[in-house]
């Protein structure tokens, strides 16, 4: 799962690198991705996803066996997938940077139609680096970008608003993964939804600008290991580029007693 900012300036040569990299996993490793603010128009002043959709075309990904559907047919901006692993049916929702109200409404309908799937939400901006959801007063809020001026059904949502309007409402939403935020670039939060279910929310961002990175050239990623019998989720942070793990408590941890039924 990739959380966006595949490019820095939303230009062809950067998209070509991003596409060629992810394409190496075709027919080998299933993958899903979202757009970050850097992947949109200049300074995210509008939802310009033309280059994103040129390099990651709907015609290709909609033919994959796990593809479920899209908010807008013909565009990869907001899509969902299903798969089965360890006897569990999973649904992945890939949501745009600062999901609009109408996108959250659509996502809720998708979740409602799949009550027996465990849901993973993959999005660019949701958690903050202080182990809370992004909300009023935080830096890098979607509302602070050009597209944040939209209103009505196109109004954007930060992490706290996403929790209120979508994440907290459905008992089968289990994980939310996000990036975007700098500072330390990591954050973890376990919250209880409206129906008593636990939701495990994580920020993991290793791009340029995060403390401890070297212009982003560290190649770190998260490995999430789910043990159904033990009801345990273990999280490791590893760089195949550096061949090393991050072993501090913010990058190596586990959740116990996870409801995986």
Regions flagged by a language model, labelled:
Residues 4-5, 36-37, 124, 179-180:
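Active-site glycine-centered loops adjacent to acidic/histidine catalytic or metal-binding residues
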Residues 1-14, 139-142, 261:
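N-terminal active-site segment of His-dependent metallophosphoesterases
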Residues 146, 151-228:
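Conserved beta-sheet core of the metallophosphoesterase superfamily
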Residues 31-33, 119, 176, 201, ...:
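Hydrophobic/aromatic residues located in beta-strands of well-ordered beta-sheets
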């Amino acid at each position: 799962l990739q959380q966006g900012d595949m490019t820095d300036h939303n230009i062809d040569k950067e998209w070509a690198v991003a596409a060629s990299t992810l394409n190496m996993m075709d027919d080998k490793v299933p993958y899903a991705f979202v757009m970050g603010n850097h992947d949109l128009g200049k300074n995210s002043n509008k939802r310009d996803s033309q280059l994103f959709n040129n390099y990651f075309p709907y015609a290709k990904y909609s033919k994959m066996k796990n593809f479920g559907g899209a908010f807008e047919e013909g565009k990869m901006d907001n899509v969902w997938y299903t798969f089965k692993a360890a006897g569990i049916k999973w649904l992945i929702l890939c949501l745009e940077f600062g999901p609009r109200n109408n996108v959250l409404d659509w996502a809720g309908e998708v979740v409602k139609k799949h009550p027996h799937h465990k849901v993973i939400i993959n999005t660019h901006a949701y958690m903050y680096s202080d182990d809370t959801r992004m909300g009023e007063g935080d830096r890098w809020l979607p509302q602070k970008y050009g597209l944040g001026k939209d209103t009505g059904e196109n109004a954007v949502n930060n992490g706290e608003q996403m929790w209120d309007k979508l994440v907290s409402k459905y008992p089968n939403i289990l994980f939310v993964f996000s990036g975007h935020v700098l500072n330390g670039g990591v954050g973890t939060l376990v919250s209880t939804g409206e129906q008593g279910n636990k939701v495990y929310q994580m920020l993991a961002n290793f791009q340029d600008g995060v403390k401890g990175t070297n212009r982003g050239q560290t190649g770190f990623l998260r490995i999430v290991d789910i043990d159904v019998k033990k009801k345990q989720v273990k999280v490791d942070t590893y760089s195949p580029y550096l061949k090393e793990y991050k072993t501090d408590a913010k990058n190596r941890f586990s959740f116990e007693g996870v409801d995986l039924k």
